[in-house]
Amino acid sequence: ASSPEVLMTEVTRDTMVERNNGAPREILSEAQVIDQRRPTEIDLGDRSLIVVPRRGHTDSDISIEISDPSVVFCGDLVWNAMFPNYVDAIPSRLSQAVRLMRRREPTTYVPGHGPLADDAAMGLYIDLLDHVEGASRRALDRGMTAEEAGTEYTLPTGLEDWTLFNPGYFARAIGAWMSELEGA
C-alpha cells in the first residue's frame, strides 16, 4: 500500500519540527513543499482545488479553495462567531487575508473555529477585525497599555453573543496591533 502524499509550506514544516519534538520527521522530510508565494493547484481527478498561501494568523496560513461548489476552507484565519486568538498574528496581514478570501459569488466558508460561514458572517468578522484595529489605534493615541485597553474593550453592537475563549484575547489582539503600529 502506498502512503498518502503530504504537501505543506516550508514554514509549516519548519514550525512543526521546531515546536513539536514528536513530529514525524520521516514524513516531514518526504513532504512536497509547496510555494509560499503563489497558489498551488492540486488535481483530484474529477475536480481540482487551489491551496493559497495567506499569512496573517500565522506565517504558515493557507486557504483551500474549490470553485464548484464555491467553498473556502479558511483555517485559523477565520473564527466564526468567536473572538480570534492573535497569539502569532500580524494583524494587518490577517485582515488583508480574510478580505482576499471573500468571494463575489455565494460561498460556504469553513472556518478554523466556529460554525460554517456565509458572506454575511464573513462581513461581520471583517467588521470585528476593523473594530479591534480602531480600538488599538485609539488606545495608542491615549497612551494606554494593551492590558488597559483590553480590559476596556467591548465587542461591537450585534456581536455581544460571540464566544470569547479567554478574556486575555482582547488584550492580546490589541497588543498585536500596537506592536505592529509602533513598528511601522
Where are the regions a protein language model picked out?
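Amphipathic, soluble alpha/beta structural segments
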Residues: V11, G56-T58, G183-A184
